[in-house]
A protein has these predicted regions:
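Short, conserved DNA-binding cores of transcription-related domains
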Residues: 1-86, 91-92
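Mobile genetic element proteins and their domesticated derivatives, centered on retroelements
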Residues: 29, 40-43, 79, 109, ...
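Residue-level detection of the helix-turn-helix DNA-binding "recognition helix"
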Residues: 45, 126, 137, 141
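Short, structured interface segments
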Residues: 83-91, 130-140
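Short, Lys/Arg-enriched anionic-surface-contact patches
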Residues: 85-105
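Short, amphipathic alpha-helical "recognition" segments used to contact nucleic acids or chromatin
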Residues: 101-116
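Short, basic interhelical loop/turn and adjoining N-cap
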Residues: 119-135
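RNase H-like nuclease fold core
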Residues: 133-174
């Protein structure tokens, strides 16, 4: 598959697609890094060697009603310099940490939630309700801060009286 299409459709830059699989309503794209890492990010020397790999699956933006799974071969690298203990996997630019979805997929979920419920978005994308809730929670945490309580005095030392009204019958309840 063309690298330009990978970049513009799913935001996968510096990756190449080695093959595609079509299984039912799912397209699986097998990708890997174009260039291997050459220098150690810790010591700066060119003594990195490949130290195995791991295959990870990520949910990508759906195309034409088909579910997209991006299957990436994530390479581990180890530094052979004396005194350097670098042993990590390569950076994954299109996903955060241990998430199983891409940044663009998360943005798509948030856009869907502007017009539908969590349950409807999960059913439309064929993912679990918990994943939709996790994506939405991360979005809310990153874009909104918790309310400030600067004007509220310490409530444990004072007694506050609240009046609760029932406006349907115009009665004071408390």
């Amino acid at each position: 598959m063309n690298s330009s299409f990978l970049y513009h459709a799913w935001g996968l830059y510096s990756l190449e697609c080695t093959r595609e699989e079509y299984k039912g309503n799912t397209i699986i794209l097998h990708v890997q890094s174009k260039k291997p890492q050459k220098t150690c990010p810790k010591c700066g020397k060119c003594n990195l060697v490949k130290n195995g790999y791991r295959t990870r699956d990520f949910l990508g933006l759906p195309i034409g009603g088909k579910k997209i799974i991006i299957r990436m071969k994530v390479q581990r690298y180890k530094c052979k310099c004396d005194g350097c203990d670098y042993d990590q996997q390569e950076n994954i630019p299109f996903a955060t940490g241990s998430c199983s979805y891409t940044h663009r997929f998360a943005k798509h979920v948030v856009d869907l939630l502007r017009s539908m419920t969590l349950k409807d978005a999960a059913a439309r994308l064929d993912i679990s309700w918990d994943m939709v809730k996790e994506i939405h929670s991360r979005y809310l945490e990153s874009h909104y801060s918790p309310p400030s309580l600067d004007g509220v005095e310490c409530m444990s030392q004072n007694y506050y009286l609240f009046i609760i009204n029932n406006f349907d019958y115009l009665l004071k309840i408390w």
